[in-house]
Amino acid sequence: MRKKLKEARQAAGLTQQKMADRLEISLRYYQQIEAGQRTGDFQIWDTLEDITGVHQRKLREIEATHPDRGANQ
């Protein structure tokens, strides 16, 4: 899960649906990005950075406990 992305979205006062609408993507696609299951393209991350005011490098971080992360990471 991208905890920083979720926190930034909530701090911006946006639901997942409202964020998806702002990004002009489906709710499911946004949910997969926030869950760390999809990466999204650079335009999405640029827009997320603009909306939240948080650098996209921080937003992209996936929690170490995410099941897709290896033990070495």
Each PLM stretch: what is its role?
Residues 5, 19-20, 30-33, 59:
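Conserved hydrophobic/aromatic packing and binding residues within compact polymer-binding modules
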Residues 24-25, 29, 36, 44:
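A subset of signal/propeptide-processing and intrinsically disordered low-complexity segments
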